[in-house]
């Protein structure tokens, strides 16, 4: 932990095409080795594929996918008298967004074959339809929180 007080939050500027902070965060999450222009090509290409496949505004589909993936509850470890309990807690809004984007990109990367554009587009469409790996991850997280509800009184 920092000794000089809280670390200030970095301001993420909205992306140039959709003027959305969420899309900018998606681009930053897709980016590897600082290659932002390549990450932008991948994300905007994926959004074009989404427009072709669904016939809807890709930003709407992405927002819907994020809402289906963002977790409300998660478990956090808490040591009490030599035992570690998984304590269910609510997820802060900033963390919800970052987890949602992280899971979408992570499960898009795990898909087999094809280019990253197609994999990302497929994962976003699946998440918008409440299917896919990222939605399953959210459900697993919620299931863990539900299973450990007995330890909810250990919240801090």
From Swiss-Prot:
InterPro entries: Ribosomal_uS7, Ribosomal_uS7_bac/org-type, Ribosomal_uS7_dom, Ribosomal_uS7_dom_sf. Keywords: Ribonucleoprotein, Ribosomal protein, RNA-binding, rRNA-binding, tRNA-binding. GO terms for cellular component: small ribosomal subunit. The keyword Electron transport does not apply. Gene3D superfamilies: Ribosomal protein S7 domain. One of its GO terms (molecular function) is rRNA binding. It holds the Pfam family Ribosomal_S7. GO terms for biological process: translation. HAMAP family: Ribosomal_uS7_B (MF_00480_B). One of the primary rRNA binding proteins, it binds directly to 16S rRNA where it nucleates assembly of the head domain of the 30S subunit. Is located at the subunit interface close to the decoding center, probably blocks exit of the E-site tRNA. Belongs to the universal ribosomal protein uS7 family. Part of the 30S ribosomal subunit. Contacts proteins S9 and S11. This is Small ribosomal subunit protein uS7. It comes from Caldanaerobacter subterraneus subsp. tengcongensis (strain DSM 15242 / JCM 11007 / NBRC 100824 / MB4) (Thermoanaerobacter tengcongensis). The lineage of its organism: Bacteria, Bacillati, Bacillota, Clostridia, Thermoanaerobacterales. The gene is rpsG.
């Amino acid at each position: 932990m920092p000794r000089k007080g809280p670390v200030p939050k970095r301001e993420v500027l909205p992306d140039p095409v959709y003027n959305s902070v969420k899309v900018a965060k998606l681009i930053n999450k897709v980016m590897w080795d600082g290659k932002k222009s390549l990450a932008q090509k991948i994300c905007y290409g994926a959004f074009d594929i989404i427009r072709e496949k669904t016939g809807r505004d890709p930003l709407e589909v992405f927002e819907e996918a994020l809402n289906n993936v963002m977790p409300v509850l998660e478990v956090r470890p808490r040591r009490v008298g030599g035992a570690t309990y998984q304590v269910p807690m609510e997820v802060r809004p900033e963390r919800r967004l970052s987890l949602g984007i992280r899971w979408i990109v992570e499960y898009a990367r795990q898909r087999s074959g094809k280019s990253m554009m197609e994999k990302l587009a497929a994962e976003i469409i699946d998440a918008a339809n409440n299917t896919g790996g990222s939605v399953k991850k959210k459900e697993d997280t919620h299931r863990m929180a539900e299973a450990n509800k007995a330890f909810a009184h250990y919240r801090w």
